[in-house]
């Protein structure tokens, strides 16, 4: 199981290293799915959009960098990410955990090499 990011599928200004690393993570998961399938090993990716609550990444300079890149105040970060989603909802740690649980469960026993976006509908991250 890999936890990627919306940025694995959609670029963000000022985050090229992060976006590249997350895109590479998806491709690694695909390669491992191919290699592991004969052994019954499943490999999937959960791609969340910004998980603000409970994430330490937002306590450092990342918050300021993302606010500056999006031309908003740092206090408006969570609202900005919520409003840019089609469903107008925030993504929480438990949402990501539930997606991981699904892929780890027998309910997804016939799934490998897949990506599940947990982003409340971020259109730029739609797979094409």
Language-model features: locations:
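Active-site loop immediately N-terminal to the catalytic Tyr-X3-Lys motif
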Residues: 10-16, 38, 88, 106
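Residue(s) in the substrate-gating loop at a strand-loop-helix junction
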Residues: 5
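A glycine/serine/threonine-rich, flexible loop-to-helix segment
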Residues: 51-84, 127-128
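Active-site helix of classical SDR
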Residues: 21, 29
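A conserved structural motif in NAD(P)-dependent oxidoreductases
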Residues: 72-74, 85-96
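Short, small/polar-rich loop/turn modules that mediate ligand/substrate recognition or access, typified
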Residues: 37, 42, 111-113
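Short C-terminal tail/terminal secondary-structure segment
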Residues: 100-101, 112-128
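A short hydrophobic alpha-helix cap/turn motif
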Residues: 36-38, 51, 104
């Amino acid at each position: 199981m890999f936890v990627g990011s919306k940025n694995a599928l959609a670029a963000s200004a000022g985050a090229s290293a992060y976006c590249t690393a997350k895109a590479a993570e998806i491709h690694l998961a695909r390669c491992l799915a191919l290699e592991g399938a004969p052994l019954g090993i499943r490999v999937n990716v959960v791609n969340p959009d910004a998980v603000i609550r409970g994430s330490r990444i937002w306590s450092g300079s990342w918050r300021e960098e993302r606010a500056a890149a999006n031309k908003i105040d740092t206090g408006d970060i969570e609202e900005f990410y919520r409003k840019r989603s089609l469903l107008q909802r925030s993504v929480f740690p438990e949402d990501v955990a539930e997606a991981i649980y699904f892929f780890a469960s027998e309910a997804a026993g016939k799934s490998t090499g897949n990506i599940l976006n947990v982003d409340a509908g971020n259109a730029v991250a739609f797979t094409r």
